[in-house]
Amino acid sequence: MFSIKVLKANGETKFVGRGEEEVYLAATSEYEEGDRVVLEYCGEPRYFVFQADDAMGAALILVRGIVEVKVPFGEARRGYSPKAFAGSCHYIYARYASAEEIDAYRNQALNVYDSHENVNSYPHATANVETRNEAVFAARNAIDGVKANSAHGEWPYASWGINRNPEACLRIDFGH
C-alpha cells in the first residue's frame, strides 16, 4: 500500500489518495507557497510510474522512501514550464511500474521530478557547481528531458550551468 498527498507548508494534508497497486488524485485548488506533492511508500526499493503534475508528465523512478516534490515558486519556477503546477485542478498519480516498463529501452537518466531535496527517488542528479544556484541552471535540468538549446537562461532553455568552472562535475545516481 502507498499514498499520494498534497501537503501544506505546515504539514497539514490538503488532499490524499491511497491504493494497493495504483493511486489517482485530483487536487482541486491552486497551490500555495510551501505546498508539496508526496509519494509515501515504505518498503523495499521499487519502481513507480509517478506524475506529480500533468503538465510535466509521468516519470519512471526508483523509489527508496518518501518522495517529496516541492511546488516551485519565485525564482525556482524559472526552471519549469509556466504550465507546471499552475491552475486550480491538478491530476496526480502513482502506480507500480511493470516489468516491461522497467526493462524497456529508454533514457535511463530521465527524471522530470528530480530536485536538490528529493533524495529518495532515482535517477538523481547532483553537481559540485551550479551557476549562481539558480533553478534554471540546476543539475536536475540535465535529466529533465527538455532538449531545447537555441537560447539560454529561461525555460525551456534551462541547463546545468557550470559557471565556467573547469572543475565542474555532474553525478547521476541510479539508486542501486
Regions found by a protein language model. Give the residues of each.
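Non-cytosolic beta-sandwich-type ligand-binding/adhesion modules
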Residues: 176
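Disordered, acidic Ser/Thr/Pro-rich linker "stalks" and the adjacent N-terminal cap
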Residues: 1-47, 52, 62-173
